[in-house]
Design a protein with these regions (language model features):
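Subset-of-secretome marker
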Residues: 183-184, 206-208
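Hydrophobic residues embedded in beta-strands of well-ordered beta-sheets
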Residues: 78, 130, 160-162, 197
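Long, charged/polar, surface-exposed segments that mediate recognition or autoinhibition
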Residues: 148-149, 156-170
Length: 238
């Protein structure tokens, strides 16, 4: 059963050794400024100038589906459905997919809305990474989720970008009438290619109930690969 109101994407980041950071006011201000510049770098990346592939996997209550999509910005139809459930996409499926992409192409992922910068707090830092937590409110999850979602980001110092964002709930919440979410975990991973900040992987895990009797048990994983810049090279390097 499709639940389009939950198409978010997630996963928890793998653990690694860090040294506890001294959360002094000066350090906190400095780290917040780094995060803000990283968000600007993400905002300045024009994703429409890149070709890439997306491999999608979904498991909804045991109903498994997969697809491979391709983005070609210079083509007449920039989005192409290549495979669905391991088989080449039919003409009908390709046409339906292209129409759907036209309807949703203006929907953009906004880090600035996701990360509450005022609430940023340092968890730890070392010579490679800064880990910070923040408050989360996602409009699509409804007002009942306020105060029940937490976020964590990993800032990569050398390349100066946000490498990963994790979101999870600390209490059950109701995103819409008759739906109850007990477990939610989302992860957005990014890659830095010549200064452009692009999606690497999105994963979501969610459990709960719908209409009191229907179980919600979903996993989705989107993997992005084969990035090739299709714009002017001086625009990428400047």
């Amino acid at each position: 059963m499709k639940k389009n109101y939950y198409l978010l994407l997630i996963c928890f980041c793998a653990g690694f050794n860090v040294v506890a950071a001294q959360d002094t006011p000066a350090e906190l201000t400095s780290f917040k400024e780094k995060v803000d510049r990283a968000i600007i770098k993400f905002e300045d990346t024009n994703k429409q100038l890149w070709s890439y592939n997306i491999s999608r996997y979904e498991n909804e209550e045991g109903d498994i589906s997969s697809s491979i999509e391709q983005h070609l910005p210079q083509a007449n139809e920039p989005w192409l459905l290549k495979q669905i459930n391991g088989q080449p996409a039919t003409h009908k499926q390709i046409k339906k997919f292209a129409k759907k992409q036209q309807q949703t192409r203006n929907i953009q992922f906004k880090l600035r809305e996701l990360i509450n910068q005022e609430s940023l707090s340092v968890v730890s830092a070392n010579e490679k990474f800064i880990i910070m937590t923040f408050n989360v409110f996602m409009k699509k999850l409804g007002k009942d989720s306020i105060g029940k979602l937490q976020g964590k980001l990993i800032y990569q110092k050398e390349q100066q970008f946000i490498q990963q964002i994790s979101i999870w709930n600390n209490a059950a919440f109701t995103p819409m009438f008759t739906a109850n979410i007990t477990d939610l975990a989302i992860t957005f991973s990014f890659v830095n290619i010549n200064g452009a900040i692009l999606a690497k992987q999105n994963e979501m895990k969610m459990k709960g109930s719908f209409a009191y009797f229907t179980e919600i048990n979903e996993t989705s994983l989107d993997s992005f690969s084969d990035y090739v810049y299709q714009g002017k090279q001086d625009a990428l390097t400047n």
